[in-house]
């Protein structure tokens, strides 16, 4: 009897949540269309590092910040604990012109959507309305594989001044990961508050441009350009490609085609443990 009462209460709770969610959807959708371009003439950029807790890379922060500051941006850095669902909802209001995201990403085969991970561990009791509407999803990152020499000597093949790979056999170690909340294109469309002001997005994570769903949602929200990966990518290649993109795009001021060509030359899929291409999606 107790279980039946509890079940009825839970069903009632979910029904009420759906009604509240519907009202919230309408309110947020209307509010989300408000523009937010009050930047006082200051160029602002941000590095959003969802990976930092599990895969820290302070030298990446330092170098990326240096490139952005040299290009005239004031730079903020947010790490795993800051990267929440609510953080992403408010992102357009923060008035960033250049947004670099270091993150786990994946594509949801069921909905044909790309999703970006937050730093929030998944719980079915949180973000109930967002889960019901498919604006956030449960996602598990690809297991990290740590490579180590299987023999006493390493056999490295030098490709160029900045890239080399190991030819001999390696031993692998798998590292378990948690489930996280991930944001979908529907969250960008429905729940982000404000508009981006011709913002450039660098989406550094697996499959962030495996299909254009997430990039298109950012473009519709006011972004001008989105770059990312068309497939799974190793962390070391991800970090190198992002830094090369910032160098060639901001410092050398190459156009997009030449910038991506330079990245392809230096981070060539032929030599990557997970072959992937750094590509872009622009406003038409």
Model-predicted regions and their roles:
Residues 24-34:
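Hydrophobic single-pass membrane-insertion segments
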Residues 108-226:
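Cysteine protease catalytic core and zymogen-processing segment of caspase-like enzymes
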Residues 18-22:
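Hydrophobic core
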Residues 2-17:
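N-terminal Sec-pathway targeting helices
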Residues 65, 88-89, 188-193, 215-216, ...:
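Short amphipathic alpha-helical segments and helix-helix/interface helices
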Residues 32-155, 162:
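A domain-level signal for caspase-like cysteine endopeptidase catalytic cores
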Residues 52-60, 91, 179-184, 193, ...:
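Extracytoplasmic/periplasmic, Sec-exported soluble proteins
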Residues 199-284:
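Active-site-proximal C-terminal subdomain of hydrolase catalytic domains
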